[in-house]
């Protein structure tokens, strides 16, 4: 469902814009659609036709998304496996300090080699109301003051629905614009569209390396854009909107954590209006990638910080409960990594 469909359904039962606005705000707070306020009961505000017609609309909205399972983690995060109306599932993560990570697609077409979500490919887009429904569900559990589009999917590949959800969350959802974070691998359309929006979100760019050839290997179906050009575009956006870019770097032991890479990262990012989030890879059994040691991660952070790059370590939330993006859904949906299966079969043949 799209947000416009929701609004049209409300208009069809006689809701005026002022009524639709109140219903929007109630839903995005995680409240019933007919919730009143401290100063005015719903029966004193909504006309009879709206009060009588809300129940079937509320039932449709409830079917958009439901919590299939909850997984509490030791770090204070709460991973939610969210079931959609057609039986598909996506992940949302309630983060410490009132944040929420939401999904924008079922699966993903980019196929990042270190990401579980890409193993299944792209199954379908989420509608704007399905994206917002993740926020409504989460707010029934605890406050949400920041929403990051870093869950399943590439937001730029579902641009219209994501931007519609951002507009809604940044107005009726009462979330500050810089607390809405649009994450992308570097789709050129992002840098054209986002500056034109009324609600201009913060931007997170998937960098992962300073080497164009390695980035093509790690992100095989991402736009062919050199890391230096990506940073240049990010810097221009950051200066325009007035809040820093987040650069994402998933640390893979022996792949992109060398001293040579860190030297290049320092040269590329020093003095830029941004922060580098280094994310130690969330290893899974039998995977070809491994996370660097804690000592190496801290050494990288210190080195970059000492060389003029604001650097933070961002572990995937919920390391003890399938913390990497897509891992929880993969376990529930029995998603198989074909390359890992082939390696196991080859190992079995060799052993025989």
From Swiss-Prot:
Pfam families: Radical_SAM. S-adenosyl-L-methionine binds at residues 153-154, 183, 206-208, 282. Its cofactor is [4Fe-4S] cluster. One of its GO terms (biological process) is rRNA base methylation. GO terms for molecular function: 4 iron, 4 sulfur cluster binding; metal ion binding; RNA methyltransferase activity. Disulfide bonds join 101-325. Its main location: cytoplasm. Its EC number is 2.1.1.-. Binds 1 [4Fe-4S] cluster. The cluster is coordinated with 3 cysteines and an exchangeable S-adenosyl-L-methionine. It is found in: Cytoplasm. The active site is at 91 (proton acceptor), 325 (s-methylcysteine intermediate). [4Fe-4S] cluster binds at residues 108, 112, 115. This is Probable RNA methyltransferase CV_2253. The lineage of its organism: Bacteria, Pseudomonadati, Pseudomonadota, Betaproteobacteria, Neisseriales.
């Amino acid at each position: 469902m799209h947000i416009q469909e929701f609004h049209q359904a409300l208009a069809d039962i006689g809701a005026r814009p002022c009524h639709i606005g109140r219903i929007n705000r109630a839903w995005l707070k995680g409240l019933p659609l007919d919730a009143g306020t401290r100063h005015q009961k719903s029966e004193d505000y909504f006309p009879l036709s709206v009060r009588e017609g809300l129940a079937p609309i509320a039932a449709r909205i409830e079917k958009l998304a439901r919590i299939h399972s909850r997984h509490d983690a030791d770090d204070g995060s709460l991973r939610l496996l969210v079931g959609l109306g057609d039986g598909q599932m996506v992940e949302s993560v309630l983060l410490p300090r009132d944040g929420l990570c939401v999904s924008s697609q079922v699966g993903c077409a980019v196929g990042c080699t270190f990401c579980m979500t890409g193993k299944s490919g792209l199954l379908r887009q989420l509608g704007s109301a399905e994206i917002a429904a993740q926020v409504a569900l989460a707010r029934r559990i605890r406050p949400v003051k920041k929403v990051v589009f870093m869950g399943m999917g590439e937001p730029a590949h579902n641009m219209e629905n994501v931007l519609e959800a951002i507009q809604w969350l940044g107005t009726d959802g009462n979330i500050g614009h810089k607390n809405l974070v649009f994450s992308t691998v570097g789709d050129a359309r992002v840098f054209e569209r986002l500056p034109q929006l009324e609600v201009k979100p913060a931007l997170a760019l998937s960098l992962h390396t300073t080497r164009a050839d390695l980035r093509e290997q790690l992100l095989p179906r991402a736009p062919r854009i050199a890391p230096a050009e990506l940073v240049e575009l990010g810097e221009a956006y950051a200066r325009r909107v007035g809040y820093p870019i987040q650069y994402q770097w998933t640390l893979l032991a022996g792949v992109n954590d060398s001293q040579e890479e860190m030297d290049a990262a320092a040269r590329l990012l020093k003095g830029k209006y941004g922060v580098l989030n280094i994310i130690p890879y969330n290893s899974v059994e039998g995977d070809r990638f491994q996370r660097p040691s804690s000592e190496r991660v801290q050494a990288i952070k210190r080195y970059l910080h000492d060389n003029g790059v604001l650097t933070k370590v961002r572990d995937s939330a919920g390391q003890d409960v399938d913390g990497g993006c897509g891992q929880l859904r993969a376990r529930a949906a029995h998603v198989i990594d074909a390359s890992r299966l082939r390696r196991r079969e080859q190992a079995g043949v060799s052993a025989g």
